[in-house]
């Protein structure tokens, strides 16, 4: 089967299993959420997908927080005590993180950022200050219907006025913490990932695997996926957004292991 043809194969179906899970709602304000990201309590499933929002969409989300408008709830999966992985809401949480840092990732560098986040748990200041990777995060809005500029246009986190900054910092965000009680594995997260939509797009099984299983072997697979010889063999210079190229590598190693 040609590599291009493989990309067209339907993702596998999985059977439904019953789980005993606990779901606990928590309302964290925006700055608490940012602190949890900074400290690594909330980990970014960086193998899941790149940050895909543009500045206009990110600006609308930040505006919603400042105005106190309701936003979709965040779903977190409890891996262990004080350690959570994002099930649904990565784009929103990264937007908060980037806005507080006042830096917005350039579109051509987002695969690199995913790898940096996975290695460090956050993005070092030396990377944030690199203008080839980031630009200033200034809110971007069109003029209002009466022709006046939008009051938040070109605002950065530190240039918000006192009322705007306070509204943003203290805005509560509903976070649903999910913990699997039985069976004693992480199996339920597959079902949760597949049933929750992020931006209207379902996660592929390989994206789910990448979020769950982090090891030196997986790091090696993702590093190999970036190698020029492999990219030439695949016939695509850019890594696949749904990580189907990674899945080809993973299945190839599985075949070698099975003999």
Residue ranges with predicted function:
Residues 37-38, 66:
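Alpha-helix boundary recognition
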Residues 38-46:
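A short, surface-exposed helix-loop junction/capping segment
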Residues 4-7, 15-27, 46-258:
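Basic- and aromatic-enriched surface patches that contact anionic nucleotides/nucleic acids
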Residues 33:
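C-terminal active-site-capping segments
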């Amino acid at each position: 089967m040609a590599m291009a043809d493989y990309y067209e194969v339907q993702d596998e179906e999985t059977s439904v299993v019953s789980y005993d899970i606990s779901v606990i709602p928590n309302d964290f304000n925006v700055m608490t959420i940012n602190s949890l990201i900074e400290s690594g309590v909330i980990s970014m499933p960086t193998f899941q997908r790149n940050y895909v929002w543009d500045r206009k969409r990110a600006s609308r989300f930040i505006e919603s927080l400042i105005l106190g408008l309701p936003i979709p709830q965040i779903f977190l999966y409890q891996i262990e005590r004080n350690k959570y992985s994002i099930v649904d809401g990565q784009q929103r949480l990264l937007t908060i993180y980037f806005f507080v840092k006042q830096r917005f990732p350039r579109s051509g560098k987002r695969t690199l950022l995913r790898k940096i986040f996975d290695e460090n748990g956050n993005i070092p200041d030396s990377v944030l200050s690199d203008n080839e990777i980031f630009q200033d995060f200034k809110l971007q809005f069109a003029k209002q219907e009466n022709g006046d500029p939008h009051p938040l246009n070109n605002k950065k986190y530190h240039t918000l006025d006192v009322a705007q900054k306070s509204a943003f910092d203290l805005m509560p965000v509903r976070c649903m913490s999910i913990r699997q009680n039985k069976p004693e594995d992480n199996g339920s997260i597959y079902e949760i990932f597949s049933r929750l939509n992020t931006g209207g797009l379902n996660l592929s099984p390989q994206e789910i695997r990448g979020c769950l299983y982090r090891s030196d072997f997986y790091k090696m697979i993702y590093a190999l996926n970036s190698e020029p010889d492999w990219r030439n063999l695949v016939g695509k210079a850019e890594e696949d957004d749904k990580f189907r190229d990674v899945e080809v590598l993973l299945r190839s190693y599985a075949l070698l292991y099975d003999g």
